[in-house]
Curated annotation (Swiss-Prot):
This is Tubby-like F-box protein 9. It comes from Oryza sativa subsp. japonica. Residues 1-51 are annotated as: Disordered. InterPro entries: F-box-like_dom_sf, Tubby-like_C, Tubby_C, Tubby_C_CS. The lineage of its organism: Eukaryota, Viridiplantae, Streptophyta, Embryophyta, Tracheophyta. Pfam families: Tub. It comes from the Eukaryota.
Length: 372
């Protein structure tokens, strides 16, 4: 199914031979009649799939359990994705065995990027920025280091659309244009860069209505899952407070994010859509003034190393932790900070998903005329 397609960004394809039949420009090779993809080829593929699907359900489940247990981290975890791509029965077995990030703290399938993050500890990620072409790349950290090779998760590219700025978010780092088949969602800002709206390409819960505005039409015509209607669904808003007096100080931001309530434990969030959604209010944690350093400070627990106006931590105000089980108003739901010129850490936890956290962090880039 399309939801489990393996692009170059998620599962490395098998290397192909680069040598031609002739072996050189001066050699003449015989013509080879093209192989027609007739009924025989289709029957052969169906027979191959049927052979794999004949395994006993108990045996298939045990195979998936062992593969899942033996591949806790990427890149070995690509074996789990490969097994899910064999056929429908193998996919169903993978869905029944692989737990969502909320429970296992791991990202396995592309669908995991729109599921709530871990419950007990934050998911460590980092963002790399390319200023030349206005692109941003989200990676999953594979080690304790602040940056490493990482596992690619999402990419975004900034476009000017009249007086507005839009960030197109995609599963594919090489396909970041309007109309992309890998379109995940987008972020849209106002002229001043102080108010942002987050749009999801898929309905966040059952009965969600797509935006009707002309500017928020879905760019991609190809849906990730043909069983679910596609469109641009508003799932959050981020706003930065105006600084009329131009006083020096940290930015102040507020977020209202639509988070599903009663998330299904299935690895495929589109298999059973959530029937309800509730807005989660987040605000940035106020930093303290350090007299000796003469700067504003936050405790990032070693995950941020460079002072920047972009650095922030988001917490839930008192009384808004239910029904997501947030411990208290000191629990950091999302933190973002600079570690190099074009590298930033991004750590998130439930109820935010990787997609939502990435979109919120993207709002920190760019000039904010009324906030600086």
């Amino acid at each position: 199914m399309a939801l489990w397609r393996c692009s170059s960004s998620w599962l490395s394809s098998v290397s192909r031979s680069s040598g031609g039949v002739g072996g050189g420009e001066s050699k003449v090779s015989p013509e080879i009649a093209p192989v027609s993809g007739g009924e025989g080829e289709g029957e052969e593929e169906e027979g191959e799939e049927e052979r794999w699907s004949r395994l006993l359900p108990e045996l298939l489940t045990e195979i998936m359990r062992r593969v899942d247990a033996g591949a806790e981290r990427w890149p070995p975890r690509r074996d789990v994705v490969a097994c899910a791509c064999v056929c429908r029965r193998w996919r169903d077995a993978a869905v029944s065995v692989v737990r969502p990030p909320l429970e296992c703290g791991r990202i396995t399938f592309p669908s995991s990027l729109k599921q709530p993050g871990p419950r007990d500890a934050p998911m460590h990620c980092f963002i790399r920025r390319n200023k030349k072409n206005s692109t941003f790349y989200l990676y999953l950290s594979l080690t304790q280091a602040l940056t490493d090779k990482g596992k690619f998760l999402l990419a975004a590219r900034r476009f000017r659309n009249g007086a507005h700025t839009e960030y197109i978010i995609s599963y594919d780092c090489d396909d970041l244009f309007p109309g992309s088949n890998s379109y995940v969602g987008k972020l849209r800002s106002d002229f001043l860069g102080t108010k942002f709206i987050i749009y999801d390409s898929q309905p966040p819960y059952d009965g969600a209505k797509p935006s009707r505005s002309q500017s928020s039409r879905r760019f991609a015509s190809k849906q990730i899952n043909p069983n679910v209607s596609g469109g641009n669904y508003e799932v959050g808003q981020v706003s930065y407070k105006f600084n009329f007096l131009k006083s020096r100080g940290p930015r102040r931001m507020q977020c209202n994010i639509q988070c599903p309530v009663g998330q299904s434990t299935a690895s495929d969030p589109l298999k059973k859509l959530i029937s309800t959604s509730s807005p989660l209010a987040l605000r940035n944690k106020a930093p303290r003034w350090h007299e000796h350093l003469q700067c504003w400070c936050l405790n990032f627990h070693g995950r941020v190393t460079v002072a920047s106006v972009k650095n922030f931590q988001l917490v839930a105000p008192a009384g808004t932790s239910d029904p997501w089980g947030i411990a208290d108003e000191e629990t950091v739901i999302l933190q973002f900070g600079k570690i190099e010129d074009d590298a930033f850490t991004m750590d998130y936890r439930q109820p935010l998903s990787a997609f939502q956290a990435f979109a919120i962090c993207l709002t920190s880039f760019g000039t904010k005329l009324a906030c600086e």
